[in-house]
Amino acid sequence: MSEGKWEEIVYPEVSGRAMMIYRNAFRKHDEKRFNQYLAKALDGKEKIHAETLYPYDLVEKVLYGRQWNQVLEAQWRQLPDYVAQETNAIVIADVSGSMSGRPLATSIGLAIYFAERNRGAYHNLFMTFSQKPEFVSLRGETLLQKIKYVERTEWGMNTNLQAAFERVLETAMDHDVPPEEMPKALIVVSDM
């Protein structure tokens, strides 16, 4: 990069954090080749590193930099799956007015991350942070659309964990959820 040899950069070998930081420079100086690489990365045909990134890293760029682009989308899709194979976990996401910065990005990022990986009746579900917690079905095709959706969910100034457990059980009973698909954890993400 410092020598201006953009055509020699092997994009699948660029670390996740470097890709996130220099994505605009790659596009500016090597647009055609970089866009071809990104198209393949979005389709899963080419590796784009994301192993050193956390969900909040990508969500922060979208929330505060309004910088959603194909690099962030491809990296989101290739984030490592840290969730055990047979584990459902429900995130209770606080998106209240007191949440900002990294706490808000963490809450939204984990809500989306776990919702996408849950199976069965809990797939694409997260829970609101409220006195009367409710399940919310994640909507949107892109990371940007999902972030905007989670950001607009209803919230309260507190949460009732007993009511959250009851909602999990009600959903299980309503959908005849087998024991192996029951959530193994409720993850409360809040600045309280």
For every predicted segment, state its role.
Residues M1-T106, E116-M192:
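Long lumenal/extracellular ectodomains of secretory and single-pass membrane proteins
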